[in-house]
Swiss-Prot record:
Subcellular location(s) per record: Cytoplasm; Secreted; Cell surface
Coiled-coil positions: none
Pathway given in the UniProt record: Carbohydrate degradation; glycolysis; pyruvate from D-glyceraldehyde 3-phosphate: step 4/5
UniProt gene name: eno
Entry keyword annotation includes Lyase: yes
EC id: 4.2.1.11
Role summary: Catalyzes the reversible conversion of 2-phosphoglycerate (2-PG) into phosphoenolpyruvate (PEP). It is essential for the degradation of carbohydrates via glycolysis.
Entries under Pfam families matching the protein: Enolase_C (PF00113), Enolase_N (PF03952)
HAMAP family listed in its UniProt record: Enolase
Protein name according to UniProt: Enolase
Binding, (2R)-2-phosphoglycerate: Q163, K340, R369, S370, K391
């Protein structure tokens, strides 16, 4: 029987040593599903709320015992005897139990853990892989990995303003080969940094975090690594950036401060021009969060200027929220949506956000968080929903590699996997 018997929850640690929630759902038939919930460092102000204990005597106030208790005392009694095959009902029940617009009562970390664990239990009950269960009969394609090879901003302790510098191996014939391209570039990048006397320590997402002088220097070094690995920039491999502009935006002056540009301040218009210069000089295919999450006028200008040349991804801008995404679609803001499960808090709402973006011809990127675990749900989700792109870090740290290895297994198991490469960016004039 696919009905929920028990829901177990546990306070465990994420990749940054901070507490997070693990949830296991067990059905009357014995089918099981277990999920660990990720956590972000730079978060959008409209995200669903992680419930933390704020007890300074435990984990510097970051404990999640309240969320764990909510699973046991509030959620489990209400979900017992519901079918794990009815994901929509489960998620609707979770949302109603919480009763707040941002899931702050029970905690998005508790709610998401239960939602995803139920989906895994359903897949186990049916004898399916998670991606097969979510996808149904939909065609399945492997995603282009957006590999974060240099970390800056809130993800590293260096002087680089932008949070992530990524490589996109669009010229590879398969995901397996794309991963190889990326790994080889990553290792060549490490060699270059050593030759320059720079440290090869890594940031939260596994990319190197060298103390470079500017954002342009980061792009230049990555280009050198691509070439040293034997690949052609702008053909085999493109570049991407997660600017995370909200992190260096001053809301009082409405200016952007770039420390690596001699502490120069930029207006929205000037920052858009700065990006335009970068994409004219470097083979940049994607820019994420290029402006502050509340700078909608700036986003409008950015989209008008660069929206047909480069993928403009909204993360903090949209926070996987259908209301925010619809507002962006109506105002013709950005052309791509980043999807983070814990920004919204249930699988059903996540799938609705993906479908909304696709119907508006926005591209979709499935993403990890900077605080990750060994959980591989996002790998299955990227394939199941044919998003075509995934952000899950660099080629180091097991919490990142776990997702890549899961994608390799999925590709091997699929009868006729497709890897579209550059065709994924269907809304650009490339």
């Amino acid at each position: 029987m696919p009905y929920i018997k028990t829901i177990n929850s546990l306070e465990v640690l994420d990749s940054r040593g901070n507490p997070t929630v693990e949830v296991e759902v067990i059905t009357l038939s014995g089918a099981k599903g277990k999920t660990l919930v990720p956590s972000g460092a730079s978060t959008g102000e409209h995200e669903a709320v992680e419930l933390r204990d704020s007890d300074s005597k435990r984990y510097l106030g970051k404990g999640v015992l309240k969320a764990v208790e909510n699973v046991a005392t509030v959620i489990e009694p209400r979900l017992q005897n519901l079918s794990v095959l009815d994901q929509a009902l489960i998620d609707q029940t979770l949302i109603q139990l919480d009763g707040t617009p941002n899931k702050s009562k029970l905690g998005a970390n508790a709610i998401l853990g239960v939602s995803l664990a139920c989906a895994r239990a359903a897949a186990d009950y049916l004898g399916l892989e998670l991606y097969e269960y979510i996808a149904g009969i939909a065609p399945k394609q492997m995603p282009v990995p957006m590999m974060n090879v240099i970390n800056g901003g809130a993800h590293a302790s260096n002087s680089v303003d932008f949070q992530e510098f990524m490589i996109l191996p669009t010229g590879a014939p398969s995901f397996k080969e794309a991963l190889r391209y990326g790994a080889e570039v990553f290792h060549h990048l490490g060699k270059i940094l050593k030759q320059k006397g720079l440290p090869t320590t890594v940031g939260d997402e596994g990319g190197y975090a060298p103390d470079l002088n500017s954002n342009k220097e980061a792009l230049q070094i990555i280009l050198e690594a691509i070439q040293n690995a034997g690949y052609v920039p702008g053909k085999d491999i493109f570049l991407g950036m997660d600017v995370a502009a909200s992190e260096f935006y001053d809301r009082e002056t409405k200016k952007y401060l770039l420390a690596s540009e001699n502490n120069k301040t930029f207006s929205s218009e000037e920052l858009v021009s700065y990006y335009e210069q970068l994409i004219n000089k470097y083979p940049i295919l994607s820019i994420e969060d290029g402006l502050d999450q509340n700078d909608w006028d700036g986003w409008k200008l950015l989209t008008q200027k660069l929206g047909q040349k480069v993928q403009l991804v909204g993360d903090d801008l949209f926070v996987t929220n259908t209301q925010k995404i619809q507002e962006g679609i109506d105002k013709q803001i950005a052309n791509s949506v980043l999807i983070k499960l814990n920004q919204i808090g249930t699988l059903t709402e996540t799938l609705e956000a993906i479908e909304m973006a696709k119907k508006a011809s926005y591209t979709v990127v499935i993403s990890h968080r900077s605080g990750e675990t060994e959980d591989t749900t996002i790998a299955d989700l990227a394939v199941a929903m044919n998003t075509g792109q995934i952000k899950t870090g660099s080629c180091s740290r097991t919490d990142r590699i776990a997702k890549y290895n899961q994608l390799l297994r999925i590709e091997k198991n699929m009868s006729n996997p497709s890897y579209l490469g550059l065709k994924v960016f269907y809304n650009l004039k490339k």
